């Protein structure tokens, strides 16, 4: 667990509380699950700081994804941790979660409000102004602008960098969050009006992400 990142997130949350009018109660720090880097999402969720975090459940293509989503949803309700399911509004509704859109696009199962309850959270990723506009049209409560910096999930992929991230975040108005390469040692380079961040390795136990990243690298090498 990156305690510098957690401390920064607590400061962001304190600023959010002082806003006038107060912002909707949206977590400022989000764990993004990943079948390779977070093989045990329930253990990762159990370790999250309380009253600060949300969870974006991905685990795309994982065997038993629906059953795992149901188990994670039950755990998140017990711990009062908001949960969104990536890319599948029908599954999100079935487990009582919100939904996470990719690039602001509709989910493959026919959209959002057809399945979700009215108060359900909607988050989205965005890599460009066009993605951001789609996300806002879809009513996203939070938009993760990514990749902010080089990330271990996508080695070699081009990153926005702090300057481009800030320019895109200004277009996001009140919804912009950072995702990709987010760690405590860099997060204070983000503008003070950053609304929060998403992370994988920084929210896992010390050393756990290194092991999972090596396993993921071997997996990718064997399947390329």
State each model region's role:
Residues 21-26, 48, 203-206:
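N-terminal ligand-binding/catalytic initiation module
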Residues 31, 103-114, 142-156, 184-224:
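Glycine-rich phosphate-binding active-site loops on the catalytic face of alpha/beta enzymes
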Residues 36-40, 127, 160:
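Short secondary-structure boundary/capping elements
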Residues 30-35, 53-135, 144-147, 178:
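Catalytic beta/alpha-barrel core
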Residues 43-53:
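A short, Lys/Arg-enriched amphipathic alpha-helix followed by its capping loop at the start of a domain
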Residues 1-43, 114, 219-224:
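N-terminal amphipathic alpha-helix/helix-capping segment at the start of soluble metabolic enzymes
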Residues 44, 83-98, 127-139, 165-199, ...:
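Catalytic cores of alpha/beta
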Residues 69-70, 157-166:
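Charged helix-capping and loop-helix junction motifs
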């Amino acid at each position: 667990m990156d305690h510098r990142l957690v401390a920064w997130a607590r400061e962001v949350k304190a600023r959010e509380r002082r806003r006038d009018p107060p912002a909707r109660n949206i977590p400022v720090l989000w764990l993004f699950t990943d079948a390779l880097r977070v093989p045990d999402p329930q253990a990762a969720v159990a370790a999250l700081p309380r009253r600060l975090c949300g969870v974006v459940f991905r685990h795309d293509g994982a065997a038993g994804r629906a059953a795992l989503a149901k188990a994670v949803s039950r755990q998140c309700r017990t711990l009062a941790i908001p949960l969104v399911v990536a890319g599948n509004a029908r599954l999100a509704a079935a487990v009582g979660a919100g939904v996470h859109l990719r690039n602001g696009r509709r989910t493959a199962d026919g959209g959002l409000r057809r399945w979700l309850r009215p108060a359900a959270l909607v988050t989205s990723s965005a890599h460009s102004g066009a993605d951001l506009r789609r996300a806002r049209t879809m009513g996203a409560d939070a938009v993760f602008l990514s990749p902010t910096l080089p990330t271990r999930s996508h080695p070699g992929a081009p990153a926005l960098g702090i300057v481009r991230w800030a320019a895109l975040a200004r277009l996001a108005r009140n919804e912009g969050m950072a995702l990709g390469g987010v760690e405590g040692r860099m997060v204070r380079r983000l503008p003070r009006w950053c609304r929060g961040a998403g992370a994988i390795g920084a929210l896992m136990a010390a050393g756990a992400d290194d092991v999972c990243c090596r396993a993921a690298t071997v997996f990718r090498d064997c399947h390329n």
